[in-house]
Amino acid sequence: MVRIRLTRMGKKKQPFYRIVVVDQKKKRDGAYVESLGYYNPLKEPYEVKVDIDRAVEWMLKGAQPSETVSKLLGKLGLYEKLEEAKSKKA
């Protein structure tokens, strides 16, 4: 199964994360299929940048977001765009 999840970047005690599409069986920081954006929890307020159109496309293909990524994408309005895309497709 393909998942949309975080992969850790940055140095010790200064993490930031890439939001990536990856096979579920790969390691956390292993090879990924595509990078969709990034999440920086150290900025105030935290910084998230995601290519929403590509994320919707991957979710329509069956990619499942992790719990954390699901919350981040929900705050960016991904699920509204996903519903629009599903209604256009039907």
Curated annotation (Swiss-Prot):
Protein name listed in UniProt: Small ribosomal subunit protein bS16
Protein family according to the UniProt entry: Belongs to the bacterial ribosomal protein bS16 family.
Pfam families cross-referenced by the UniProt entry: Ribosomal_S16
Top-level taxon: Bacteria
GO biological process: translation
Keywords (A to Z) from UniProt: Ribonucleoprotein, Ribosomal protein
PANTHER family: 30S RIBOSOMAL PROTEIN S16, SMALL RIBOSOMAL SUBUNIT PROTEIN BS16M
HAMAP family per UniProt: Ribosomal_bS16
Species per Swiss-Prot/TrEMBL record: Fervidobacterium nodosum (strain ATCC 35602 / DSM 5306 / Rt17-B1)
Single Gene Ontology MF annotation: structural constituent of ribosome
A GO cellular component entry from the record: small ribosomal subunit
